[in-house]
């Protein structure tokens, strides 16, 4: 079999979703590296005047940190510039989709869910999966998420729901659309 490509990501974590339809739902997050936008106008005093922008990430010495968690949160420009600026590339993880699935399972595992399943073995609650970035619908990230979802299906460990935090600029790949419909149909047939 063809060996899987490795993808750059900045972090995997779990938390309770705080926005939108899945507010309050336990969520596993994968934050991909790279974005097609930079959004330097965020938080600026004069967002329509780029010549006035302050971009604190630009002057930050990225060699002083070795973990994403130790970066400051910028209040001007993109608050997650570490997810796309090349100067932070040394902080990124690099794994195949199958390895990323294992990292996510490990993140989800605890004393009551030792296997890290999306369907909690005791409460029967289903965890949510959120792909974010960066831009999680750039072609490389779409490919990675499609392969990851296939691995989750093959392992009979399917997220209760899946969302993408996207800027909405990317064309959807055919395999992405196909795996999305598969996921929707699987949920429609559940009792």
Locate each region found by the language model:
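Single conserved hydrophobic/aromatic residue that forms the stacking wall/gate
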Residues: 183-191
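Auxiliary Fe-S-binding modules of radical SAM enzymes
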Residues: 2-20, 24
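Conserved Radical SAM active-site core
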Residues: 7, 37-178
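Conserved, mostly hydrophobic/aromatic
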Residues: 30
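Generic structural "secondary-structure junction" signal
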Residues: 15-18, 80, 186
